[in-house]
Every structure is written in structure tokens, then in C-alpha cells.
């Protein structure tokens, strides 16, 4: 059963440009190489919620866990952490529509 890796974070102040360059040039291509399919990206405009939410699809829970245990995932995540704060994630059964 397909699952969705839902990640949330806030962009670190004064790192917006570097963050966007990293996401477009390294993070998205990197997660695609690992086997995750970008499904959605949301930005919070109002309220006390994470600034960014991203959804990635994996074939199943074991695939998601294998990807997240890989060295390549760790490297992408560590680089992401230089640009963001308050990172969180969860793996849930994928369904249509917005999931939080």
C-alpha cells in the first residue's frame, strides 16, 4: 500500500534564498533518485503551524523506511537542516487530498 512521507519545517531566517536554491537543485532531485515521488508542497500563510509542509510518496512502508535509513537520505537531511528549523516528519497511508 502506498504511503506518504509528510515533512514539516520552518525556513531559517536569513536563509531563504539558499534554502530555495538547495530545494530546487539538490533536495528534490535527490529524493527522486532515492525513489520518493514528490506529491505536494504547502506553505502556511497564517497561523501557528509549520511554514512548509511537503508530501512524498513511497511504494510502501518498508520502502519508505529503507530510503530514510540510507546514507544518501541522511546527507540530504543534514544539508536541509542547515536551512530549516523545527523539522518534523511522519509516514502515513497515502490518500487523496490534503493530509497533515
Protein language model regions, located:
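Charged, often glycine-rich, active-site loop that binds/positions anionic groups
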Residues: 53-55
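Active-site-flanking beta-strand signature of metal-NTP-handling nucleotidyl enzymes
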Residues: 3-10
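An amphipathic, aromatic/His-enriched active-site/gating alpha helix that lines ligand/cofactor pockets
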Residues: 24-39, 57-92
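Short, surface-exposed ligand-recognition loops at beta-strand->loop->(often short) alpha-helix junctions
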Residues: 10-22
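Residue-level signal for secondary-structure boundary sites
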Residues: 15, 62-64, 97
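A short beta-turn/loop motif at secondary-structure boundaries
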Residues: 43-48, 82-83
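Residue-level preference for beta-strand/loop junctions
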Residues: 1-3, 48-50
Amino acid at each position: 500500500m502506498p504511503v506518504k512521507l509528510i515533512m514539516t519545517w520552518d525556513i531559517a531566517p536569513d536563509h531563504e534564498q539558499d534554502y530555495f536554491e538547495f530545494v530546487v537543485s539538490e533536495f528534490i532531485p535527490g529524493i527522486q533518485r532515492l525513489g520518493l515521488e514528490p506529491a505536494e508542497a504547502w506553505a502556511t500563510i497564517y497561523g501557528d503551524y509549520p511554514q512548509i509542509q511537503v508530501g512524498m510518496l513511497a511504494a510502501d512502508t518498508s520502502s519508505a523506511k529503507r530510503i530514510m535509513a540510507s546514507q544518501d537520505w541522511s546527507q540530504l537531511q543534514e544539508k536541509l537542516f542547515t536551512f530549516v528549523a523545527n523539522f518534523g516528519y511522519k509516514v502515513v497511508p497515502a490518500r487523496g487530498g490534503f493530509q497533515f
